[in-house]
Amino acid sequence: MSHQHPVYRRIVVKVGTNVITGRNGKLDPAILDSLTSQIAALMQDGVEVILVTSGAVSAGRGIVSLSGNLTPVETRQVLAATGQIRLINAYNDRFKKHGITGAQLLVTKGDFRDRQHYLNMRTCFEALLQQKIVPIVNENDAVAITELMFTDNDELSGLIASMLQVDANIILSNVDGLFDTQSEGNPVIEEIDPGTKNFSQYIRPGKSEFGRGGMLTKCNIAHKLSRLGITVHIANGTTPGILQTIAHGGKAGTKFIAQKPKQSRKRWVALSEGLEKGAVIINQGAIDALTSGQRATSLLPVGITGVEGSFQRGDIIRICSTDGKVIGYGMASCTAEKARSAMGQKGLKPVIHYDHLYLVP
């Protein structure tokens, strides 16, 4: 059912490479015109929009004729560095026609690793939104370390959606949504319940031609966000008026229904896979206490059998069983050194407080 007024007040719009590039791999002016016009219309209706866009590398392909023997990493760096200028200008030139200013933010995964850095970044976004400026975000491919690169911009959009406590994350791809491959005709699945887990049965083989992400990545990010209280839509960005349809409650693509929102720090921890600076190994008794669901339980030193890495208070750490299975993630309440000296002992303060603990479903 469509509504006269938008059902969301703050959204992230993630635009995939295959949405804004044509078959020749170059930026598609008509699609860019459409998307920026839709965003401008939503802003006029009072919706705050954060734009996460891929496409810098593809834009670079339309500018640079590479020569010499560059490694794949060097090639990506050159194309991203040159293409990002064209990409941001393509958006800003169009936003200007609507009286809107865009701001470029290039980030790396490491920017989300430190809590204080994370909070500083959030302050910047909030200030831009307060001034009615559109944050235009992309991964800083030119300087990103391979080990700390995002899986793709779907992951980046999820981190930003969580950080800014948005109402919805709209992931625009070049497909209509998640298809039900188990049903005749393979219809688009309109809604996904937060309890759904096995998405691979609905995924068709293949992935984006120029981008790094596929539908399974999108579903996993969407599922995690929905469990954190953020609605996620996966839809076709080339469909005319797609953002208006979704923002006003109309049916389009696949909607991942949100659960009750979680606390800010819990959201940060929940999306911190790959950002951890160490790990604690816990025994079965601690696992049972954390996962019983009977009451809120912090991770105490008595249940810890090992400590890995060198982390400080406030760093993200991984929680593992003795056989290496990841149980969850948490924000350390002490240093690795103190955790080692305390492990196995009773009556001491938690190594990870419940409010800063996220268990893998």
Swiss-Prot record:
The keyword Amino-acid biosynthesis applies. It catalyses: L-glutamate + ATP = L-glutamyl 5-phosphate + ADP. Substrate binds at S54, D141, N153. Residues 277-355 form the PUA domain. InterPro entries: AceGlu_kinase-like_sf, Asp/Glu/Uridylate_kinase, G5K_ProB, Glu/AcGlu_kinase, Glu_5kinase, Glu_5kinase/COase_Synthase, Glutamate_5-kinase_CS, PUA. Its EC number is 2.7.2.11. ATP binds at K14. Pfam families: AA_kinase (PF00696), PUA (PF01472). Keywords: Amino-acid biosynthesis, ATP-binding, Cytoplasm, Kinase, Nucleotide-binding, Proline biosynthesis, Transferase. Catalyzes the transfer of a phosphate group to glutamate to form L-glutamate 5-phosphate. This is Glutamate 5-kinase.
